[in-house]
Amino acid sequence: MATETLMPAPAIVIEPHQWQELSAILRTHLPGRRVWAFGSRATGKRVKRFSDLDLAIEGEPIPLKEAALLDEALDESRLPFKIDLVELSAIAPEFRARIEPSLVLIQN
């Protein structure tokens, strides 16, 4: 059985209590998948209080039902910012090349 490793909250720009909630959601809905943060909260540049958190999910496409449950968990969370999810297997190579420099591993 693979062990999941989570990065500490300081790896991305969110509060520790927000990290606890987010990491619990990721462990529940994306077990065994690598998840990366990117964008302003990953780089720390131009972050505002309500800046969204961009997450890239590695692996096979997420089945529709599982994706809906993940979206629901994020919507019902107490996180005060929007979370945008992208699946690395489904994005254009140009977009992937653009985000790769800012990728921060948050779940392994």
Please place each PLM-identified region on the residue numbering:
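Catalytic core of pol beta-like nucleotidyltransferases
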Residues: 1-34, 42-49, 58-108
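Short, well-ordered beta-strand segments
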Residues: 54-56
